UniProtKB/Swiss-Prot annotation:
Transmembrane segments: none annotated. It comes from the Eukaryota. InterPro entries: RGI1, RGI1_sf. It comes from Clavispora lusitaniae (strain ATCC 42720). Coiled coil: none annotated. Belongs to the RGI1 family. This is Respiratory growth induced protein 1. It is found in: Cell membrane. GO terms for cellular component: plasma membrane. The keyword Cytoplasm does not apply.
């Protein structure tokens, strides 16, 4: 008889995550992500490849990845994608996915209201705690189609670091956050990118 695999959970205590105090030089491993591209005038230009995408199915793993990238000094070069049932849905169905109602989707004003609250008051704030630096996404640009709603956030600010420190280590980056839901089920898609500028 073989033992079944245990589901691994990632321990993450948001109250014990340390704040990123100072920037450091770009990691040497980033050199492998630079490629040469021919420009319009025929000369070769060095370009940074987009960060590889990591996929997650639970919020704790997603947040742990963001925390780990910060402490691996890769906070400005990562791409994470999360597909999950938001906590307010799981709470309503008592963690039994079989009890999910067909009306729990983007067409329900209650679902939309709860999702917007979750994004603003929980998701973004928890991501900020995990990454250890300031996030200022501001107001989202909302795009709605008959099949889905997408909220797009962008932060091109200084992330709480002095300009001199960013210039010294050449650590300028922008953050993009895209949250979407559809008209078929309550699954939410979160796409987070940190891209050097």
């Amino acid at each position: 008889m073989t033992k079944g695999k245990k589901k691994q959970t990632v321990e993450l205590d948001l109250n014990k995550v340390e704040k990123l105090e100072h920037l450091m030089p770009v990691p040497k491993s980033r050199q492998s992500s630079i490629t040469s591209v021919e420009s319009e005038d025929g000369s070769l230009k060095e370009v940074l490849k987009p960060p590889p995408r990591k996929d997650f199915e639970d919020l704790a793993s997603f947040e742990s990845y963001i925390r780990d990238e910060t402490w691996d000094n890769e906070f400005d070069y990562c791409h994470a994608h999360l597909t999950y049932y938001p906590p307010f849905v799981l709470k309503e169905v008592h963690d039994d996915i079989e009890k999910i109602k067909p009306t729990m989707n983007k067409n329900s004003s209650k679902f939309r209201r709860n999702l917007q609250h979750h994004i603003q008051r929980h998701l973004i704030l928890e991501m900020e705690k995990c990454c250890g630096f300031e996030m200022d996404f501001g107001k989202a640009k909302m795009e709605e189609t008959p099949k889905n709603i997408i909220w797009r956030y962008e932060d091109s600010g200084d992330h709480g670091f002095p300009k001199e420190e960013e210039d010294k280590f050449n650590r300028h980056w922008k953050l993009e956050l895209e949250v979407s839901c559809n008209n078929e089920n309550p699954l939410v898609q979160v796409d987070y990118k940190a891209i050097p500028v």
